[in-house]
């Protein structure tokens, strides 16, 4: 495994090399730009399949009524809403996001759906979470880890705030496993997606970054190893839709 570019003082922002200290601001600008069209963005990036991926992700999580759950990079709240159904009236979900605009959209959408009790919203950096050790039964992050500057630090923080016996889950765009599909996927990502972003959201640059960020994200086996290095045990992953996305799971034992 190559040395983390973060440790060298630089990291990637899409295909660009930038100072690690600047990535958080740059990513923040992207998500402030796309916050109101975030679900549209995911529809364009996944051709609408992200909704099924998210339902499966939550349905297969280790969570039960009464549990306390942390959903990082919670965005517009769709994962948090599904998790709240699983933990029930006695359970609680904390929706955490570093971006105030995304957090506001999530709060408004869930409130408009009548989802108020047992939901909290915290603006936080995944690399330095403002929670006590052993606070949550389940920690999730969906389509957010690739935007974290120091992914190793983010994984260590997920481990720290997880209760013993708890599970961490990562849903993320990943490395396509079928060679024949890779050229098609690249064409959609780099030729079609930015144009759709320009057409529907008047923002091609943000969509270009998001496509590039997927290619820079660690492939499945590397992310599994990173989770193990962060302290998680029984780490494994499951590819969905030919590896377009994968679900990584690990436990604090």
Swiss-Prot record:
Function of the protein: Methyltransferase required for the conversion of demethylmenaquinol (DMKH2) to menaquinol (MKH2) and the conversion of 2-polyprenyl-6-methoxy-1,4-benzoquinol (DDMQH2) to 2-polyprenyl-3-methyl-6-methoxy-1,4-benzoquinol (DMQH2).
Reaction catalysis annotation: a 2-demethylmenaquinol + S-adenosyl-L-methionine = a menaquinol + S-adenosyl-L-homocysteine + H(+); a 2-methoxy-6-(all-trans-polyprenyl)benzene-1,4-diol + S-adenosyl-L-methionine = a 5-methoxy-2-methyl-3-(all-trans-polyprenyl)benzene-1,4-diol + S-adenosyl-L-homocysteine + H(+)
EC number: 2.1.1.163, 2.1.1.201
Gene behind the chain: ubiE
Similarity comment: family membership: Belongs to the class I-like SAM-binding methyltransferase superfamily. MenG/UbiE family.
Pfam short name (any one): Ubie_methyltran
Transferase as UniProt keyword: yes
Keywords in alphabetical order: Menaquinone biosynthesis, Methyltransferase, S-adenosyl-L-methionine, Transferase, Ubiquinone biosynthesis
GO biological process, one term: menaquinone biosynthetic process
Name of the molecule in the record: Ubiquinone/menaquinone biosynthesis C-methyltransferase UbiE
Pathway entry: Quinol/quinone metabolism; menaquinone biosynthesis; menaquinol from 1,4-dihydroxy-2-naphthoate: step 2/2; Cofactor biosynthesis; ubiquinone biosynthesis
Binding annotation for S-adenosyl-L-methionine: 76, 97, 125-126
Disulfides per UniProt: none
Protein's UniProt keywords contain Transferase: yes
Gene Ontology terms, MF aspect: 2-methoxy-6-polyprenyl-1,4-benzoquinol methyltransferase activity; demethylmenaquinone methyltransferase activity
InterPro entries, per the entry: SAM-dependent_MTases_sf, UbiE/COQ5_MeTrFase, UbiE/COQ5_MeTrFase_CS
């Amino acid at each position: 495994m190559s040395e983390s570019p973060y440790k060298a003082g630089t990291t990637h922002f899409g295909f660009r090399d930038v100072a690690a200290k600047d990535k958080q601001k740059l990513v923040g600008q992207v998500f402030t730009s796309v916050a109101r069209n975030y679900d549209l963005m995911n529809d364009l990036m996944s051709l609408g399949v992200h909704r099924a991926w998210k339902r499966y992700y939550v349905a297969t999580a280790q969570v039960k009524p009464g549990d306390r759950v942390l959903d990082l990079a919670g965005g517009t709240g769709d994962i948090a809403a599904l998790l709240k159904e699983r933990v029930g009236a006695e359970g609680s979900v904390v929706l955490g996001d570093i971006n105030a605009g995304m957090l506001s959209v999530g709060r408004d959408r869930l409130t408009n759906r009548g989802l108020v009790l047992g939901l909290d919203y915290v603006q936080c950096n995944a690399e330095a979470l403002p929670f006590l050790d052993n606070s949550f039964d389940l920690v999730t992050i969906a389509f957010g880890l690739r935007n974290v500057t120091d992914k190793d630090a983010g994984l260590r923080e997920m481990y720290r705030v997880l209760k013993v016996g708890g599970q961490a889950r990562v849903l993320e765009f990943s490395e396509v496993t079928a060679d024949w599909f890779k050229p098609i996927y690249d064409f959609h990502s780099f030729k079609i997606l930015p144009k759709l972003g320009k057409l529907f959201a008047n923002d091609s640059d943000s969509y270009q970054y998001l496509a590039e960020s997927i290619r820079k994200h660690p492939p499945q086996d590397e992310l599994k190893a990173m989770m193990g290095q962060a302290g998680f045990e029984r780490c494994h992953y499951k590819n969905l839709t030919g590896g377009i996305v994968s679900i990584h799971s690990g436990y604090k034992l």
